[in-house]
Amino acid sequence: MARVLVLLSVVVASLLFSQGATFESQRLFNNAVIRVQHLHQLAAKMMDDFEEALLPEERKQLSKIFPLSFCNSDSIEAPAGKDEAQKSSVLKLLHTSYRLIESWEFPSRNLGNPNHISEKLADLKMGIGVLIEGCVDGQTGLDENDSLAPPFEDFYQTLSEGNLRKSFRLLSCFKKDMHKVETYLSVAKCRRSLDSNCTL
């Protein structure tokens, strides 16, 4: 009888530990999603402010440029849209988000200092790294050689009124990438959610 009680207490303790780890994981996912939503909103606000400062003719000219523009992050293999993201594994979504955030470490310094974007990106990257570590169970982790050495282009070097095209590209790419990361983290969070009715 004593063995049964010991075994039962081990099983109960194991379940409680597992449930606690799940809640901690959910808390970390919530924090990551909130942080990237804030960055996406900041990017949208910066873009709106930039466009409002343009003359109508400049605005018209720049709107033709971006669809043809190349973003630094376009070289990162990533799901195209929400449908493809929903078919990807949580670990792949986290890896992709990590690499997208990492690709902005240097360029974010050129975005000015609205609420310290570089610091917010570093915090988010660290949080995603913790989530990756928590998801890795016998799977390949994020190795040092898996980190991105960004191929910076000239348009990532300057954000100034003197070069509207470069500034517009930088802000557009930042906004686009924060939207991607927000989508990927939201899908991953939903997949790991205890709520079976989690929808995006």
From Swiss-Prot:
Signal peptide interval: 1-22
Question: GO MF annotations for this entry?
Answer: growth hormone activity; growth hormone receptor binding; metal ion binding
Entry keyword set: Disulfide bond, Hormone, Metal-binding, Secreted, Signal, Zinc
Question: What are the GO cellular component annotations?
Answer: extracellular space
Q: Which InterPro entries match?
A: 4_helix_cytokine-like_core, Somatotropin, Somatotropin/Prolactin, Somatotropin_CS
Query: Which subcellular locations apply to this protein?
Result: Secreted
List positions binding Zn(2+).
H38, E182
Give GO BP annotations, semicolon-separated: animal organ development; growth hormone receptor signaling pathway; hyperosmotic salinity response; positive regulation of growth; positive regulation of receptor signaling pathway via JAK-STAT; response to L-arginine; response to peptide hormone; response to starvation
Which Pfam families does the UniProt record give?
Hormone_1
In the UniProt record, does the keyword DNA-binding occur?
A: no
Q: Which domain of life is it from?
A: Eukaryota
Disulfide-bonded cysteine pairs: these are C71-C173, C190-C198
Give the UniProt family note.
Belongs to the somatotropin/prolactin family.
- State what this protein does: Growth hormone plays an important role in growth control and is involved in the regulation of several anabolic processes. Implicated as an osmoregulatory substance important for seawater adaptation.
The name of this protein is: Somatotropin
